[in-house]
Amino acid sequence: MIPTFTALLCLGLSLGPRTHMQAGPLPKPTLWAEPGSVISWGNSVTIWCQGTLEAREYRLDKEESPAPWDRQNPLEPKNKARFSIPSMTEDYAGRYRCYYRSPVGWSQPSDPLELVMTGAYSKPTLSALPSPLVTSGKSVTLLCQSRSPMDTFLLIKERAAHPLLHLRSEHGAQQHQAEFPMSPVTSVHGGTYRCFSSHGFSHYLLSHPSDPLELIVSGSLEDPRPSPTRSVSTAAGPEDQPLMPTGSVPHSGLRRHWEVLIGVLVVSILLLSLLLFLLLQHWRQGKHRTLAQRQADFQRPPGAAEPEPKDGGLQRRSSPAADVQGENFCAAVKNTQPEDGVEMDTRQSPHDEDPQAVTYAKVKHSRPRREMASPPSPLSGEFLDTKDRQAEEDRQMDTEAAASEAPQDVTYAQLHSFTLRQKATEPPPSQEGASPAEPSVYATLAIH
């Protein structure tokens, strides 16, 4: 018995503080309308009330109407309720508040929501004095006029945080009107405006909206902080609201824009510098190559032939078309003993004394056999001194060869020389009685 009593006492002590804390005032809900609080006659509107997850019921009250005006169960996840108005009429215009009920009681009332209906009266006219195009820092006045005896006017700026501005009308003229001065004008004042007219005893019923007026602000981007607009010639009601927020003009977007422009400019300059550097390097390399080529051409004597190969033996070069066009070979004749199977018939131009004489050599060859030695031939005629290299660098030989279709190939070689040294050699003493042999020409033949 005693342990049971002790357990119940501890449970009561532990639940006591919690119950005491929850019994306090609940936070007030949030109330708003979609698509907005200013609704044209005949259009639908939805009122939302949002509380906490512990809410069990939501209630909507309308001023000057029996309470509660409507009750709704919460929607999942049970933190808000919806109140629908299918068609807006004069009966729905007014001021609303909402509550929600939790297990511990009802919450505090929400902030008021003013539901305004337009289209109850004829539309007024809206104009700008002196002009809808105003320079930043100057003053401008928006004038709303009505032909009907209206005493309340409202000015609305589209997409503004606080769209409504209530002002009383000015009496003493045939046309009732209200002035909305703006001084000094800044960039935040620019935009599209409309005005409404109504009676003071029911300012939730408005006229049709006026034609839109576009206010254009030109000049410097940095403007002073706008001051709240008030009518000088009218008395403001307690429901007056500022036309625009009175905070400082935000410049974060402009600063970000300048930062982007500066970054793009820096990147462009870097890319241009890199391109100029590459072009300069390419121009310098081309200039060095041109100078090196000119120096090489200057060191080589004009008309000098390519240096002849030092190897004077028989050189054979094979190609894939060798079986069809015959063998291509280079033969250097340096002694008086031609290779086996080669018969050379030389014919010299009649102008032997011409330094640029042309000599044709008919070469009849067969497969050379390197293991057999040919008999020595007599040495006579003119020959080229091969020991003097510097004197023979002026010699150039162009050869043209044509493959013959006969079983034995016949090749003609054209010898074009710039400087020829002719030397006549006397026959050996053992051949004085023999008939003189034809002169021989020793040259390097390159047959392609």
From Swiss-Prot:
GO terms for cellular component: cell surface; cytoplasmic side of plasma membrane; extracellular exosome; plasma membrane. Residues 1-21 form the signal peptide. Changing residue 188 to A: No significant change in APOE-mediated activation of LILRB4. Pfam families: ig, Ig_2. Changing residue 91 to A: No significant change in APOE-mediated activation of LILRB4. Residues 281-448 are cytoplasmic. The modification Phosphoserine is found at residue 319. Changing residue 170 to A: No significant change in APOE-mediated activation of LILRB4. Changing residue 41 to A: No significant change in APOE-mediated activation of LILRB4. Induction: Induced on monocyte-derived macrophages by S.typhimurium infection. Induced on monocytes and dendritic cells upon contact with CD8(+)CD28(-) alloantigen-specific T suppressor (Ts) cells. Disulfide bonds join 49-98, 144-195. Changing residue 121 to A: Significant reduction in APOE-mediated activation of LILRB4. Changing residue 165 to A: No significant change in APOE-mediated activation of LILRB4. Contains 3 copies of a cytoplasmic motif that is referred to as the immunoreceptor tyrosine-based inhibitor motif (ITIM). This motif is involved in modulation of cellular responses. The phosphorylated ITIM motif can bind the SH2 domain of several SH2-containing phosphatases. Interacts with PTPN6. Inhibitory receptor involved in the down-regulation of the immune response and the development of immune tolerance. Receptor for FN1. Receptor for apolipoprotein APOE. Receptor for ALCAM/CD166. Inhibits receptor-mediated phosphorylation of cellular proteins and mobilization of intracellular calcium ions. Inhibits FCGR1A/CD64-mediated monocyte activation by inducing phosphatase-mediated down-regulation of the phosphorylation of multiple proteins including LCK, SYK, LAT and ERK, leading to a reduction in TNF production. This is Leukocyte immunoglobulin-like receptor subfamily B member 4. The gene is LILRB4.
